[in-house]
Amino acid sequence: MNATILVKIITPLSIALEKQAKMVTMSGEEGMFGVLPSHVPMIVSLKAGLVQVYIDDMHKSENTYLISSGVTEVTANYINIATETAINVTNFSEAEIATKLLDLQKTLSDQH
């Protein structure tokens, strides 16, 4: 499968990521889900967690971002992820990602 989908992770301050991908996985309010090219259109609320972007290999994530809650708009050709915070954790260890996630969840709970 050579088809790709454009994925953008957008924060109030910047576009954290803008790349063509073969697949993207993320944490919705109802659980983890994946998006492939030609996906049916949808809008989904996201919870704090990982967004994994698969560029060349659908079995190995090549870009991983930790996001705060947000919303994603999916069409057949693109995925827009709007979030307050996006941290590139591609080269972090699992322990470092877990620590960052706990810190982010604490910050979010302190705001509410």
Curated annotation (Swiss-Prot):
Localization, per the record, is: Cell membrane
Q: How does it sit in the membrane?
A: Peripheral membrane protein
The record's disulfide annotation reads none
- According to the UniProt entry, the coiled-coil residues are none
Q: Which GO terms describe its molecular function?
A: ATP binding; proton-transporting ATP synthase activity, rotational mechanism
Q: Is Ion transport there in the keyword field?
A: yes
Taxonomically, the superkingdom here is Bacteria
Q: Which UniProt keywords apply?
A: ATP synthesis, Cell membrane, CF(1), Hydrogen ion transport, Ion transport, Membrane, Transport
Is Membrane set as a keyword in this record? yes
Major place of localization? membrane
Pfam families associated with the record: ATP-synt_DE_N
Cellular component GO terms held in the UniProt record:
plasma membrane; proton-transporting ATP synthase complex
Q: Which family does it belong to?
A: Belongs to the ATPase epsilon chain family.
Tell me, in a sentence or two, what this protein's role is. Answer: Produces ATP from ADP in the presence of a proton gradient across the membrane.
Subunit relationships: F-type ATPases have 2 components, CF(1) - the catalytic core - and CF(0) - the membrane proton channel. CF(1) has five subunits: alpha(3), beta(3), gamma(1), delta(1), epsilon(1). CF(0) has three main subunits: a, b and c.
Q: What is the protein named?
A: ATP synthase epsilon chain
Q: Which organism is it from?
A: Rickettsia africae (strain ESF-5)
